[in-house]
A protein has these predicted regions:
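A glycine-/small-polar-enriched, mobile loop at the entrance of the PLP active site in fold-type I
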Residues: 17-73
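Conserved beta-loop-alpha segment that forms the PLP phosphate-binding cup at the N-terminus of a helix
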Residues: 66-93, 97, 101-105
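General beta-strand structural signal in soluble alpha/beta enzymes
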Residues: 20-22, 70-73, 94, 117-118, ...
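Active-site C-terminal subdomain of aminotransferase-like
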Residues: 27-28, 203-288
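Conserved active-site segment immediately N-terminal to the catalytic lysine
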Residues: 191-203
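Active-site phosphate-binding strand-loop segment of PLP-dependent enzymes
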Residues: 126-184
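Active-site-proximal loop->helix
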Residues: 103-114
Length: 290
């Protein structure tokens, strides 16, 4: 059934908003916006189950994982808080080289979790050697490392694969990664890099409206969460895991944003992740040259 004319005019004139020359929110394609203009469905019924199950393979592919990918109606900061409140029962080492690395540290402090900042000059990456020195010099002190993969405030891409390998040298330490401006735009490998928690938001490299956060968690992360009573209610990692096989959300979702996610995941998979990463790299190089 065709959309009413006034609605169709609204969702097919994105050029009125101009081009967004900023990390996000990004320009959203008209067909993705149009996908949102559909009736709301009951989020505890078969319609929601079909919607989420239909995206399952694509979302796992996006994160390069066999683990389920959780979708939350929140900003990505919500899943940053999830990492802090669900994955540490001791002290946290936050890798800070920009505004969003600092945000991880601030969240830890606000949530009453002891945390230290391993800071580098803004515009420089954290090196594996620096992290190894920090962990080796403080044995048994830290149980969680947080890092931003693509630090939006500086443009630095941290070597997360190598940093995760350093963390894996320590049996009781987990690693949580902010991939907000990298997932969907640059290579991120949840399984191959042996990460414990990876999060992103809808409004950056996924080119969706703001309002959704996505994350994946390792078995190690879930085992850690089971030992922490005060995990948060809204951002309880175990509840996300419990709902995942049912293809249900933990709380009332923004259904129409899920429609947009479904439409955009179809576009991303049609393009192919490798091709999408290459396209982003080519655009970056053209911008740097200009």
């Amino acid at each position: 059934m065709p959309l009413p004319d006034p609605i169709r005019v609204i969702v097919t004139k994105p050029m009125e908003f101009g081009r967004f020359f900023l990390p996000g929110p990004t320009e959203v394609r008209p067909e993705v916006l149009e996908a949102m203009v559909r009736p709301v469905i009951g989020h505890r019924g078969e319609d929601m189950e079909r919607l989420l199950s239909g995206m399952d393979t694509a979302l796992r592919g996006l994160f390069r994982t066999r683990r389920p990918v959780y979708v939350s109606t929140s900003s990505a900061t919500g899943f940053m808080e999830t990492a802090i409140t669900n994955l540490s029962r001791g002290r946290i080492l936050c890798l800070v080289g920009g505004a969003f690395g600092a945000r991880f540290h601030k969240i830890a402090e606000r949530c009453g979790r002891p945390a230290d900042a391993l800071a580098v000059e803004w515009g420089t990456p954290h090196t594996p050697a620096l992290l190894r020195e920090a962990l080796d010099s403080s044995p048994g002190v830290y149980d969680l490392v947080t890092v931003v993969h693509s630090e939006t405030s500086t443009g630095v891409l941290n070597p997360v694969a190598e940093l995760a390998a350093v963390v894996r040298e320590h049996e009781d330490i987990l690693i949580a990664v902010d991939g907000v401006t990298s997932v969907g735009g640059a290579r991120v490998e949840f399984d191959a890099w042996d990460l414990d928690f990876l999060l992103t938001g809808s409004q950056k490299a996924l080119a969706l409206p703001p309002g959704l956060a996505l994350a994946a968690a390792s078995r190690r992360a879930l085992e850690r969460a089971e030992t922490i009573p005060a995990r948060s209610y809204y951002f309880d990692l175990l509840e996300f895991e419990r709902r995942a096989p049912e293809f249900q959300t933990t709380n009332t979702p923004a259904v129409n944003l899920f429609y947009a996610l479904d439409a955009q995941m179809e576009r991303i998979m049609q393009e192919g992740l490798e091709a999408r990463w290459a396209r982003h790299q080519a655009m970056a190089e053209r911008t740097w040259a200009w």
